[in-house]
């Protein structure tokens, strides 16, 4: 049995429903889904879904990630997968090469290795934000490995200490009050910097595709020979190897989702 952890606020519960439909498409039957509904009562009715109403505070719900993972360790201590709500799994997901036993979660690498965001003030001056401020704050001089995305990771009881430290950053009122200065990409920034701080070099590599488009989903599902390709020449839709695409991240556009779900239903 695999144990899945997900969370959302009330606006994104529909994505959890879509994810469950993708599990059926991938023929994943032996699972439990620990679903944390942030500040509301879920209306999902599924015997495989364990619904947990989690209290809401002023943070973005991304920052609840490590604490709900820690809470799930009270239910089960092995074979755990965390997924963001905007993910659909591939038909290949049953073959995902999950590994456990390390003292840290295992993530997938990002196609964008130096992401940044920015603000522009009233005079048109741009200020960029990335992981550098948090690295400097923690005395981390360099990366130990490539940048990873926090949309997915595997973990077990051995990761508890890492998750506790990760949680401490995601609940740190001082750091949170500084906004993008320290956390350019919400919980993902401290996840990366903590991995580098510990000198960790292990990850899954690139095992997914970022996309909101049905056409990208379909072409990757139906072909195993797409290698090192920017789909539609889009830098954000990088496909390293379609035979090892196990899920799709960023599936948020309603019209495109409806096409994907129709395809899933027709091929389940």
What are these regions (language model features)?
Residues 61-69:
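Glycine-rich, basic loop-to-helix element that forms the pyrophosphate-binding segment
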